[in-house]
Amino acid sequence: NDMLSNDLLYINQGDGTFHNEAARYLSYQSRASKGNDIADVNNDGLPDILSLDMMPDDYQTLKRTVNGFNYLHYAGDEEFGFEHQYMRNMLHLHNGFNNDGMIPFSEIGQFAGISATDWSWSPLFADLDNDGDKDLFVTNGFPGDIRDKDWTKIKASAAGSLTTELALSEMAPRLKIPNVVFENTGNLRFVRKDDWVKEVPSFSYGAVTADLDNDGDLDIVVNNINDKAFILKNRTVERSPGNSSFIRIKLKGSK
């Protein structure tokens, strides 16, 4: 959930009902949670959880934007019974089950190197280079960067004036930025690979992976606001067929 309301982690109770166990299983959460994905990032057979936020990935933008968190927020969470939230991507690593059946997740987003990707929406875990590890693709961008401190001052000064909400929104900077891809290098570490995908600034939201041309590697389809969709062709098998592993299954029936 975005901002005040906490994220929810519904665990199947085995009796046809689900119960929110986020407070027990997760030590803390992303604050302005956007998209999420669940995948086994370290190939231990257990599902890990990634939730995206909107923390800038460069120093200049970070200092130019509203952080969204201070001690008053922290104290408010304590006072009103909310779980603690921080404005960055969270990667919750599944540590297996303890004696009472609880899943003790560890949050490792900063350790893994994927905690800051700017205003992000859809994360996709997928083995993009066919090496057996799940890599990460993240969509980015927003038509109006309402985190910008100059814009927040303009909005505050316009209170009580005849300036319309539409006019104010059009004053916000356009956050048209490239999407991001990370290579899973093993040992719970990810490395940003700008050479894997051409850096095209966009307002990208939804995305999906599929082997569109049946060549054995996963392509990516990205949906954009006010622009054409992207189809990102994966050339892993084409460029390095000897170092690429995949399984092709052909079904043969009686008819």
Identify the residue ranges that each predicted region occupies.
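Acidic, glycine/proline-rich Ca2+-coordinating loop motifs
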Residues: 1-255
